[in-house]
Amino acid sequence: MATANFGKIQIGIYVEIKRSDGRIHQAMVTSLNEDNESVTVEWIENGDTKGKEIDLESIFSLNPDLVPDEEIEPSPETPPPPASSAKVNKIVKNRRTVASIKNDPPPRDNRVVGSARARPSQFPEQSSSAQQNGSVSDISPVQAAKKEFGPPSRRKSNCVKEVEKLQEKREKRRLQQQELREKRAQDVDATNPNYEIMCMIRDFRGSLDYRPLTTADPIDEHRICVCVRKRPLNKKETQMKDLDVITIPSKDVVMVHEPKQKVDLTRYLENQTFRFDYAFDDSAPNEMVYRFTARPLVETIFERGMATCFAYGQTGSGKTHTMGGDFSGKNQDCSKGIYALAARDVFLMLKKPNYKKLELQVYATFFEIYSGKVFDLLNRKTKLRVLEDGKQQVQVVGLQEREVKCVEDVLKLIDIGNSCRTSGQTSANAHSSRSHAVFQIILRRKGKLHGKFSLIDLAGNERGADTSSADRQTRLEGAEINKSLLALKECIRALGRNKPHTPFRASKLTQVLRDSFIGENSRTCMIATISPGMASCENTLNTLRYANRVKEFGISPSDIPFSQGSGSRPDLSPSYEYDDFSPSVTRVKELTVDPTAAGDVRPIMHHPPNQIDDLETQWGVGSSPQRDDLKLLCEQNEEEVSPQLFTFHEAVSQMVEMEEQVVEDHRAVFQESIRWLEDEKALLEMTEEVDYDVDSYATQLEAILEQKIDILTELRDKVKSFRAALQEEEQASKQINPKRPRAL
């Protein structure tokens, strides 16, 4: 086989090649293939090295300057050309002769004339000469090469090459965008109105490097531990085609993809990032949540401490599931809740030698706080009174403590309490817990308190969304829930900062848990449960902001685990928008009262004279510790509590205090009425005697009637004032402004 003539082609030089899609670009020659007269070339495209095999004819057609030199000279086997051919060849070698034959003016540049003018005149002359001689094949080798490979082209300048590169990149980018649009069109779910948001969230998650919390991670010691738990989408949300807008990329980071819309109706995502001590995704079981949250607190109560663990979140976000146990339909498996898991570890700790010698006894209580009132769930929901003794210790009068010997006893008490807990229907849940349930495990040594573990399942944290136009009872539920949650937050903040005063009297919940917020050996854990659905996005953000206020964390871009290939943020197409991650997104401003802004705060705390002020004067309760703590609470949360909302809370607190006094006075009058009946019965029996003392009868009857009139008149006046307070509460509820948007 004859050896292929590669001309000026050498390994390592760059040649122009033509791709199958018509693109022309440079590539480096890597090998010369003599067996099939081809060359192998390679080039770099999108960071990848690509190559192909191209025949010599294609190479020479695009690179005529690489044509072999011997093809230009006449071959020895070729017979001498006729005269006409020789004349043509002579013209080719001496271009000026051609110009003089045509009698054209002498050109200034022979190359330009020869290439632009002489060449077109040669081929018709050659064609006519060949026809006259009767031979078409008698063509010079130079003309044969030109006919085969076309006229030689000039070398491209760097500017032209750069323009061609830009054009190539533009075409490539358009091709990629077209492929992306076609791919999106295939993925479009016409039945889902939020498929754009779904694609944005999916693409964003693809840029993250997931490092979720595992059981192998260490457990850190915290005096105040704040964690977040995400539940999976439920059946109702799945049927409604709701989207999961919560992402937990690492063990302490929670991201909320909040859908937004511009003025031009373009939809985009606003990503808000929060950091906590722990973050549990929707695959974490109750046992794992308990391991990092409540389990470290069990040892605290054996060391004469007070421990508190509470679940906080929107209705239906999984609070009762976390604290009470797994649900199977309407049935609850109490053995898998934090209540039972904590009790199990308590009994295991009792068997340890260093605690066994203490001879500790375990007791349990279970009560609920509903609309500011306390009810014993283990004693047929008996209403209880919360009082302070002379040592300023809070006592829940009448609360039953039941001794428990094993975990089974605890499970029975939990079943009894859950069966009679107050619930109601809200927009988020058909069976919603509307009360705070408090389950306490108490250790006593020889009758004296040794330690207490309070496990609280809080009511839903909806800020009046379901109570704006409801009846009084539901309205009071929402008011008490919101007030108690604000008070709980401030009490925990005071515990973490060792503040001298804790506003625990602002609500019944914090008043009952007072001993858990005071003392150096007090520890608290908060489990914020969140719903993943897009429909619950606002309530989810409220929950996360509340948790962030309890224990303020900072967040930086380095805390977000982006994958290595994506850099600090993913590549975004023009239809995507993501906010930069900055600490200002999630750092919630600490609310303190600025002394220089007292004029701004004064209208919130002082109101024009109204019926409440008149009632304060009459009842003498205007400066009670409860109302002082309520004022302090509202001052510390002035951005969340508007003047109208404070007036409403003030009216509700006043009404609740008056209600308790009216009921207490009514009970006292009833007991006194029994004594009056006995006295009146004795007087009537005296009149049946023949010679009874009429003066004594009249005197005693008059005394009884005067006493009755005085007591009943006082009770009637209080009832009238109580009715006025009810009207004042109703008027205040109508003046509450909608919740102001939070500026981050």
Swiss-Prot record:
Domain spans labelled Kinesin motor: 223-553
UniProt key word Cell division: yes
Ranges of Polar residues composition bias in the record: 123-140
UniProt-listed SUPFAM superfamilies: P-loop containing nucleoside triphosphate hydrolases
Coiled-coil regions, chain positions: 154-187, 698-737
Gene Ontology molecular function: any one: ATP binding
Pfam families according to UniProt: KIF2A-like_1st (PF22923), Kinesin (PF00225)
Compartment(s) where it occurs, according to its Swiss-Prot or TrEMBL record: Cytoplasm; Cytoplasm, Cytoskeleton, Microtubule organizing center, Centrosome; Cytoplasm, Cytoskeleton, Spindle pole; Cytoplasm, Cytoskeleton, Spindle
GO cellular component: centriolar subdistal appendage; centriole; centrosome; ciliary basal body; cytosol; mitotic spindle; nuclear body; nucleolus
Location of Phosphoserine modifications: 75, 100, 135, 140
Cross-referenced Gene3D superfamilies: Kinesin motor domain
GO biological process assignments: cell differentiation; cell division; microtubule depolymerization; microtubule-based movement; mitotic spindle assembly; mitotic spindle organization; nervous system development; regulation of cell migration
Top-level division of the source organism's lineage: Eukaryota
Keyword Cytoplasm set for record: yes
Entries under InterPro entries matching the protein: KIF2A-like_N, Kinesin-like_fam, Kinesin_motor_CS, Kinesin_motor_dom, Kinesin_motor_dom_sf, P-loop_NTPase
UniProt binding sites for ATP: 313-320
Basic and acidic residues: compositionally biased ranges: 159-186
Free-text function comment from the UniProt entry: Plus end-directed microtubule-dependent motor required for normal brain development. May regulate microtubule dynamics during axonal growth. Required for normal progression through mitosis. Required for normal congress of chromosomes at the metaphase plate. Required for normal spindle dynamics during mitosis. Promotes spindle turnover. Implicated in formation of bipolar mitotic spindles. Has microtubule depolymerization activity.
Family that this chain belongs to: Belongs to the TRAFAC class myosin-kinesin ATPase superfamily. Kinesin family. MCAK/KIF2 subfamily.
Subunit structure: Interacts with AURKA and PLK1. Interacts with PSRC1. Interacts with MCRS1; the interaction enhances recruitment of KIF2A to the minus ends of spindle microtubules which promotes chromosome alignment.
Protein name in the entry: Kinesin-like protein KIF2A
Originating species: Pongo abelii
The organism's taxonomic lineage, starting at the top: Eukaryota, Metazoa, Chordata, Craniata, Vertebrata
